[in-house]
Amino acid sequence: MAINHIDWAIKAENDWKVVKLIIANNYDPEDILCYHCHQVAEKYLKAYLHYKSLQQIPIHDLLKLLDKILSIEPGFSILRSKLKILNLYGVRPKYPDDYFAPLKSDCEEAIGASKAVRKVCRKFMKLDKKKLK
């Protein structure tokens, strides 16, 4: 089975569900909340690459994914500052060797950034009014 943009968008939505669950749990655990905010953005950017039939790049760096997208869609440039925020949470929260405890304000910033990325990606893929399973 060939993977397409909808498959990636569904995975991103699953991460978004986790974000909402952690918000409902009073932002606990904060590090995992921020990690899943990054995952929402990463998977939606990869969904867009699939949507445009661009070669997938196996990286977690959101700014590098953005640069690839900008080669065909300059409208994504509005996300650069949001992706810069989220890039802080792609790898670091996953490992115990560098204790990482974001503040509630960091969480709120990450949530806002991932929400913006989600909205833009869904709009460009014409998924903004579509419910994904």
Predicted regions and their residues:
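Terminal alpha-helical segments
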Residues: 1-133
